[in-house]
Amino acid sequence: MKPVRLIRIVALALIFAFSVAAQSPSDPIREAQRLTRVAQVAQQQGRYDDAIKAYQTITVVAASSPRIAASAHLAAGNIYMMMGRFEESVTAFRKAAALDPASAEAVNNLGEALGELKQYQPALQAFQKAVALDPKYLKARYNMGVTYDRLGQMKYAEFIYRILIRDFPDFALAYDSLAVSLSKSGRAREAVPFHEKAISIAPGDPSFYFNYSLTCLMLGDVKKAQVQQQKLRALDPAMAEHLAAVIAKRQRS
């Protein structure tokens, strides 16, 4: 999910939280609603620090409404993530999860922020908790696989991706990730059909061609790698140029 879309979804969640809390109208709730609109406008205009300040003010104004305050911390955390301010996003997501312990999204996002800081074991624990809160939360389940991969636990990553493919047969990223995991484990030939399946589901994703090309190189099939590179060129010329350099280096070695 793209960061901007994620922020919009959180903003909608805030509005919903207000609608529930506003059953007992109060000045703090109305002020929080006003500040949410201020934050949304600031986000749209690219004034992210102003948006964060507005959300932080909501957490104070709506301190007596934990759900609203949690949503505000979550929104601020997502903006921090988009800005690459990962330590601050960790703090925001932790506050959101503390105020709303049932929020799988807050816990998952905490895991993503920890992952960006290369704190993979705590990140994995966060993803596992998010999945326990919501077993159907696709993003958290996928993040578990990615984190196992980063920890070098390829068998666990493979297991997660295979379960995702079983439960979500149209989830292209699971096929591609499984293919990459297999290639990294020295099983490049097994990876080929999963690369091809990922591309058949989502032919517009440049990374799928890049990864497939790398697997072809592992198999010594330079010609097929170059075919994927040419397909990639139509989608992402810069990525294709990088891949061309990788192929050329492999040919020289």
Where does each model-flagged region fall?
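N-terminal leader/linker segments that initiate helical-solenoid repeat arrays
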Residues: 20-71
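Terminal, low-structured helical/coil segments at or just beyond the last alpha-helical repeat
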Residues: 26, 32, 210-253
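Structural signature of tandem alpha-helical TPR/SEL1-like repeats
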Residues: 48-53, 57, 71, 82-95, ...
